[in-house]
Amino acid sequence: MTLREVSTASDLREFYDVLISGAGPAGMTAALEASAAGARVAVLDENPRPGGQIYRDITRNRPERKSYLGPDYWKGKQLAEVFDRSTIDYAPRATVWSLEGRDETVAKVRNVVGVTVGGSARMIEADAVVLATGAQERPMPVPGWTLQRVMTAGAAQIALKAAGAMPSEPIVLAGCGPLLYLLASQLIDAGVSDLTVLDTAQSTFRMSVLRHMPEFLRSPYVLKGIRLLFKVKCQACVVSGVRSIAITGSERAEGVRFTTAGGEQAIPASSVLLHQGVIPSTNLTNAAGCELRWNDEQRAFEPVTDNEGRSSRQGIYVAGDGSGIAGAQAAEVSGRIAALAALCDLGLVSVTAVAARLKPLHKQARRFLRGRAFLDALYTPRSSFLAPLNPETVVCRCEEITVRKIREAIALRPPGPNQLKTFLRCGMGQCQGRLCAATVTEIMAEERKVSPADVGTYRLRSPVKPVRLAELAQLPHTARALKAVTGRDPVDHDTNETGHISCPDTDIASCGQVQRRRPTSAGIVA
């Protein structure tokens, strides 16, 4: 048996029992579970090889990098090798840009997925779709974050895993969260000697943190976390209690100014890595109409699911960090659980057999979730970083919208973030809000003195990722393809004499005012 790697969209089948978006820990285990039950399975992933962000390039990485990437990274190799020996259809470098859920009221009994592979687009049907899209880094807009040589900690870690590349020294690593110290440890082991960690986490001795301490002490993360903190604090310059950060430089980062209880300081920097935690990637779940809810502990929106990963839309399941941040081991278990739920709902595995498999999996999941509440409370970002105070800080990098402009627009009392778009185009650039949505929600909540749950987030529509018109032009002119592109029902369009649905210039413009070489609000690139 061997993995069936797909290089173009035409190589994909028209229908799958289970279609999975994402080839990280959750996506791989979901695919293996479904394939073992005899289901027709496809995995669509943006990366060139399976593994996701946590196990990036695990199948081809060099042994000499083992010393600094650590044992947790190499745990993923066995899973990736099992995945590689399966008979699953696997499409690397694939972009999933549309997902329409089932709607039996109009006789649409299958999910429809829009995907681009190898420069061509295609619509695929699936009885069940498992979204294992993982997490994304929470944006950390500070003055100077748009300068050259400033990147997220996650981006630096990707370069380290994929190419063994390291930022130029001296390096400043700023923010909060477990990844901050993990990356610091990896950089130290890789040979970095001039490293400063600016820890923006609030005091550990808060009641919201201490009440979760007993459970955390029983978790599998305690000793690992203590060793990590001790190592970094012994081998790098760690500054705790940082309250504000500004990156200085004309065209590229040259230094960092920061404040603590002791006052303001400035240090030189050739590279600045920012990080303040991760949040679920909800673009597809949002665009598919799945219900989202605000998680106040993780300061993020997440899809509403049951204990088996079923979303509010029939036939759509969510697994891994895309349903709530829990880590790689929990994601592996979550993928298996979601796949079993899908197989049961499709009648491919009996209810009795699924129940027997789920019991030990739920037990494992509870073990991996133990201590998560402590970490969420400990690394809750400061409000001044969630909703930046400096009025000239850029929030929307695509459209260059500052904090000042956003606060001025909020003063005009738009109902929510979606209406704010019409004032500023904030969130209408090529990233489609991935880098600004969380910050806009936090600023609006602060201005109105309400919870982010009352504010909401951007409402997304397909395409949720940038797609070229040349790729979309290869789609057959069917009703479902046209709706995936324009977001409009087929009844709104004319049908020509040959039976094809026409899409006049006005329809294309309604997708987001297409301009040459400029991304539109719908993610279309001319």
From Swiss-Prot:
Record-given protein name: Opine oxidase subunit A
Record key words, sorted: 2Fe-2S, Iron, Iron-sulfur, Metal-binding, Oxidoreductase
Family annotation (InterPro entries): BFD-like_2Fe2S-bd_dom, BFD-like_2Fe2S-bd_dom_sf, FAD/NAD-bd_sf, FAD/NAD-binding_dom, Metab_Enz_Cyan_OpOx_G3PDH, Opine_Oxase_asu/HCN_bsu
Membrane-spanning intervals of the chain: none
Ligand binding ([2Fe-2S] cluster): C396, C398, C431, C436
Function (record text): Oxidative cleavage of octopine into L-arginine and pyruvate.
GO function terms (MF aspect): 2 iron, 2 sulfur cluster binding; metal ion binding; oxidoreductase activity
Enzyme Commission number, as recorded: 1.-.-.-
Pathway it works in: Opine metabolism; octopine degradation
Enzyme class: oxidoreductase
Cofactor: [2Fe-2S] cluster
Sequence similarity: To T-protein and to dimethylglycine dehydrogenase.
Organism: Rhizobium meliloti (Ensifer meliloti)
PANTHER family registered for this protein in UniProt: ANAEROBIC GLYCEROL-3-PHOSPHATE DEHYDROGENASE SUBUNIT B (PTHR42949:SF3)
Cross-referenced CDD domains: GlpA-like_Fer2_BFD-like (cd19946)
Oligomer status and interactors: Heterodimer of a subunit A and a subunit B.
Pfam family, one: Fer2_BFD
